[in-house]
């Protein structure tokens, strides 16, 4: 899907991901709901730092990146995550980015492990190393149609560690909703003696404190 998406962007004019008007990937009208700030919330003891609140515009950008593989949408998410990393990490030399992996079925459908691909690009841009150390060890359902308790049950015990994860670990995901994914990823690290000191996402659907 990825090569086709990149070819289509060469053939068809660019449109705003929010309202589909011809022009830049995010137009001035939609920019008001896609303007990275710095939000903080908690998932158990894990502090989650995010750039944006979940809005209809944010939803469209996630879908354009995740399901359509559009580079312009990828770039918006990457820039949002880098914005928060710049705000929340004083010394990048100590930290390692741990991406949340996609399921095997999602990887086959999309042609990539979505967040792993984003974090690889973030690592190249920032110089912060990535450790791709997590994998889903069993089949899980698509989280989008599940409620809070169903999400937690769906992911319980689903992540395993496939390589050591040393350093100051930061979990990276595109969006935090109920926190079930980040909670399970942190559990998998903790079970092998490693610890995530925090998490960064582009978008939060949780009640979050805006810091700046």
Predicted regions and their residues:
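Glycine-rich phosphate/pyrophosphate-handling loop used in enzymes and phosphotransfer proteins
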Residues: 1-212
């Amino acid at each position: 899907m990825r090569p086709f998406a990149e070819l289509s962007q060469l053939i068809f004019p660019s449109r705003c991901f929010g309202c589909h008007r011809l022009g830049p990937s995010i137009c001035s009208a939609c920019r008001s709901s896609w303007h990275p700030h710095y939000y903080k919330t908690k998932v158990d003891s894990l502090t989650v730092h995010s750039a944006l609140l979940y809005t209809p515009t944010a939803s469209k950008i996630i879908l354009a990146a995740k399901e359509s593989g559009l580079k312009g949408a990828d770039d918006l998410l990457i820039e949002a995550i880098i914005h928060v990393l710049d705000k929340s990490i004083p010394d990048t030399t100590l930290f390692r980015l741990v991406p949340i992996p996609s399921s095997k079925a999602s990887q086959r459908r999309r042609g990539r492990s979505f967040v792993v691909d984003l974090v690889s690009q973030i690592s190249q841009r920032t110089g912060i190393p990535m450790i791709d150390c997590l994998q889903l060890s069993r089949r899980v359902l698509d989280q989008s149609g599940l409620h809070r308790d169903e999400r937690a049950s769906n992911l319980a015990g689903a992540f395993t560690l496939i390589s050591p994860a040393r350093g100051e670990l930061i979990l990276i995901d595109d969006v935090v909703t109920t926190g079930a994914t980040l909670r399970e990823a942190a559990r998998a690290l903790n079970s092998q003696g490693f610890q995530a000191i925090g998490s960064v996402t582009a978008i939060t659907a949780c009640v979050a404190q805006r810091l700046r």
